[in-house]
């Protein structure tokens, strides 16, 4: 997290130091909220974020007497999704509006202790019809199709949900917007031989690639896109002589959206 915060600060300072006869009035706007989230579940479910983000109820787990062991309820009452953030704006660089955001909550778990967790940390260069985003923010598909709702987990597991380090380019033409992005994994990771981990994507070297085109008018948004993901689940294995050797196994997927 410290490396990502440092990267954003360096990029912002670099942009500021390169200003030549351009407007340089930095504006800081803090924001945030306190959320005390109470939830009652009548059944055991697949959950995350301190068991507050409910994704899907677990299937029946019957014992020999026919009792469903997952048919039991529980409650959660936590404030860890309270949020703090700062928006930075008011600068110009390369004839573009330069802005940035740093956002965190308290949903970083270490055992039974919660810690400050990085949600977003990025800079943005915005021209009249295009923009470049560098840093950790919402996955491109999530930004345009996720409604603002009160509940923490509304729409899961069908609602796309991911914040990732990325380099993204958006171009707007009339009511259309075209997006190209290269993304890396951080918190939201892929499953593999050692469980969920970002190592499989890191070992593959190639970033996740995303391309899309969308049409938006008033309350209607229509679009299509494609997402390419390449993973390298392992880098070594044992041969017939029980000697550890290098392997180049890869898993590739193309997902139309």
Locate predicted features.
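Sec-dependent N-terminal signal peptides
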Residues: 5-13
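A short secondary-structure junction signal
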Residues: 145-146, 181, 189-194, 225, ...
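Extracellular loop and loop/strand-boundary signature of outer-membrane beta-barrel proteins
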Residues: 69-72, 107, 150-155, 190-199, ...
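Detector for outer-membrane/organellar transmembrane beta-barrel domains
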Residues: 218-257
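Solvent-exposed, glycine/polar-rich loop segments of beta-barrel outer-membrane systems
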Residues: 48-58, 237-245
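Outer membrane beta-barrel
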Residues: 23-50, 60-188, 205-206, 210, ...
